[in-house]
């Protein structure tokens, strides 16, 4: 299994909602749709905080005060049709922007990223209840723990 390190950022708005991106990827068992926080793979030799700041800049076109990591999480999943042994370094940031927009994403990312929007902790819980795939699975609790909700 190929190791992977990624930086994820819980970006909060003034109301305590977190910004999530709806993604669609092809896996060996077919199409997989899910919501997750901003972020991506840490480049070789890159520090996690540097990667988190880069991902926010690339995906939102913003320079935010990114803090952390506030926690790390280990998981395994299929990425680009290959199983990955992943460690997420999770950070927090605050954003005053009303309407989130994806900027600076690559053509490959555009094909994968379908939608971006703010979610309250209650909306995250309701999404889970409807059967939506939202990562991390304990996002609502993490939102409340780190300043949202």
Predicted regions and their residues:
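Charged phosphate-binding loop/patch that engages nucleotide di/tri-phosphates or the phosphate backbone
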Residues: 130-149
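Short histidine-centered catalytic/ligand-binding loop motif
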Residues: 35-43
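Unchanged
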Residues: 42-65, 75-130
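Active-site donor-binding loop signature of nucleotide-sugar glycosyltransferases
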Residues: 23, 39, 121
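Structured alpha/beta reader/binder surfaces that contact nucleic acids or chromatin modification marks
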Residues: 72
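A generic structural signal for ordered secondary structure
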Residues: 17-19, 69, 90-95, 149
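N-terminal strand-loop-strand
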Residues: 1-36, 64, 68
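Juxtamembrane/interface motifs at transmembrane-helix termini
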Residues: 40, 87, 146-148
């Amino acid at each position: 299994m190929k190791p992977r390190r990624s930086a994820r950022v819980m970006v909060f708005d003034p109301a305590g909602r977190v910004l999530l991106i709806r993604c669609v990827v092809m896996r060996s068992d077919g199409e997989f749709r899910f919501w997750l926080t901003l972020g991506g793979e840490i480049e070789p030799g890159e520090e996690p905080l540097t990667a988190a700041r880069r991902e926010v800049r690339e995906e939102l076109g913003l320079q935010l005060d990114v803090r952390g990591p506030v926690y790390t999480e280990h998981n395994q999943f299929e990425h680009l049709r290959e199983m990955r042994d992943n460690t997420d370094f999770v950070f927090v940031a605050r954003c005053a922007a009303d309407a989130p927009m994806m900027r600076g994403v690559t053509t490959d990312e555009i094909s994968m990223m379908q939608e971006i929007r703010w979610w309250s902790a209650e909306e995250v819980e309701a999404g889970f209840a409807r059967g939506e795939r939202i990562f991390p699975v304990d996002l609502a609790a993490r939102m409340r723990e780190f300043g949202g909700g």
